[in-house]
Amino acid sequence: MVADGGLKIHGASLEARGLSKAFGGARVVSDVSFRVEGGALLTLLGPSGSGKTTTLRMIAGFEDPDAGQILVADEDITERPAHRRNIGVVFQQYALFPHLTVAQNVAYPLEMRRYGRAEIRSRVGAALDLVRLQGYETRYPRQLSGGQQQRVALARAIVFEPPVLLMDEPLGALDKRLRETMQIEVRRLQQQLGITTVSVTHDQVEALVMSDLIAVMDGGVLHQLASPLEVYQRPATQFVADFIGESNLLVGTLSEAVGSALTFTTAKGLRIQTQGGAGATRLPGATHLAGATHLIIRPEHVRIGPDAERAANRYAAEVLEALYVGDLLKYRVVAETGDELWAKTLAPATGQRWSKGQRVTVGWEPGDSLTVSA
């Protein structure tokens, strides 16, 4: 793709096949596989120690995998040294040279590749235009804000027109408001350039906002690879459901009801109609289902008050907590069985709000819950 600023980038497919890595006998990445098509953005999402940064470093060539392959444009680059992979990298702390100006920092990878002066000047100007830093050429990193430093690092990573861009916690050093602004800005630039991108973050909102695909990792294992919508609405495991967004997690057993409908019964006796999910695997000839011991219900799907009266699943409950969080109201309620749930609604300017100790009805539809494996 030819960007408005003049750089010509052709995003290439990126594939990891069975990547594994251990340090001192401890396995930190275990058989991780994924494919990113040209021009797409994949986020490796997970907590600290999940293996996401090690996976990124193997793609960059900074770590050698113990097993597996890395392919760019279907070409195996596993044995190729980092400086010959033609991959752009944005580091968490930006790694700008403090003694070089903005223009000199951006020009550095071009100088290492022995580009001519005129070409360097043209490409540096184009890259700085793309990240909206025209007029900052002669400033030094210490004279820039955190967001501006991040833009310089991004310009440096794309100035040599790599087909693949890697970003390690690129927004982690920014404050919340600036981070939210830069999420949109980085995504805009990535789409404008059409550059294939893999980004690492522990921030679930960042992953949901920026990604075409999310790879959720924990303990070196890839739990789910799917679109942001699929990961949020259809989490494949309990870990994914807990890590992304807020969830009500109920423990119990799942049995067959009428037709394809299922009944989940909590350990405390609450019976819930559900449509099943990733953990609903029927045993041949049995009335019970194997593997599904947890039910997930997002708080925004739990209705409260009159709105719950017509729900297929509806229960008498008592409000234990009522929290006002600006645009939202959050309620912790307990059903007559003792099962506790969170409900989340938009905060009305006027109208019904519930208080601690009030008796209410809560409810949701079968399709609003999901069974997952532990």
Locations of regions flagged by a protein language model:
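ABC ATPase nucleotide-binding domains
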Residues: L41, R80-G88, Q92-D242
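The feature captures the beta-strand-to-loop junction immediately N-terminal to the Walker
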Residues: L45-P47
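Helix-to-loop junction immediately C-terminal to a conserved catalytic motif
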Residues: A60
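Conserved coupling/switch loops of ABC nucleotide-binding domains, chiefly the family-specific signature
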Residues: D66-Q69, E119, G219, V251
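Conserved ABC transporter NBD signature motif
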Residues: G68-D76
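Non-catalytic connector elements of ABC transporters
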Residues: S247, V258-A374
